[in-house]
Amino acid sequence: MKGGWGALERAIIKTIPVLSSYQTGGCQAVYEISVGYSRTRIQFGTPIGRFQRVQDHIINLVNQLDAARWTSNEAIWKLDSGREPFDSVHLAKVVSSEAYLQACDHAHEVHAGVASMTEYGLTLHTTASRTLYTYLGDPRFHRHKLAAALGL
């Protein structure tokens, strides 16, 4: 169909910020689960959230969450305000995909063995993060699109 790809590409450009926001919400949920667990899990007579290594993982979760939130919000803002969104859209997909994946990895470090149980909610986020990582293009694809949009 003549001109069909252009219409599809415009639709995908409008869909990616929604997907990025969904992944950001997943990061937020993983963060909340991990912080709650680190406050209630007692080891050696103290909550595990007091241990420096656990705090390091929580800080990494916050960093991933903030990066995903800022880039997703910028992409949505540019689309909503009628500005040229291509660079922000591709950047949001790269950052949010990697953030959700890495946030789940850090959450598994905080939770240790309990995180691998299917009854525990973290496994749902881990599966979703791996699935959505490549949905509508993996980060490598979007890095190439971002470079092309920036003229690099």
Where are these regions (language model features)?
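Alpha-helical interface subdomain recognition
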Residues: 10-152
